[in-house]
Curated annotation (Swiss-Prot):
Subunit annotation: Interacts with hair keratins.
GO cellular component: intermediate filament
Function of the molecule: In the hair cortex, hair keratin intermediate filaments are embedded in an interfilamentous matrix, consisting of hair keratin-associated proteins (KRTAP), which are essential for the formation of a rigid and resistant hair shaft through their extensive disulfide bond cross-linking with abundant cysteine residues of hair keratins. The matrix proteins include the high-sulfur and high-glycine-tyrosine keratins.
Keywords: Keratin
Domain of life, per lineage: Eukaryota
Name of protein: Keratin-associated protein 22-2
Family of the protein in this entry: Belongs to the KRTAP type 20 family.
């Protein structure tokens, strides 16, 4: 399931930001991750 995740005061899409848990963040489902990448390309993944 996709959901909005607030990270450093800005909306993020998909699962929680990976580095919060010390991993790359790919544990979330791909469509959510890919959508987040498209919507916030300036963020580090």
């Amino acid at each position: 399931m996709c959901y909005y995740h607030n990270y450093y005061g800005s909306l993020d899409y998909g699962c929680s930001y990976g580095s919060e848990y010390g991993n790359s963040g790919y544990a979330c489902n791909f469509p959510c991750s890919y959508g987040r990448f498209l919507l916030a390309p300036r963020k580090k993944f």
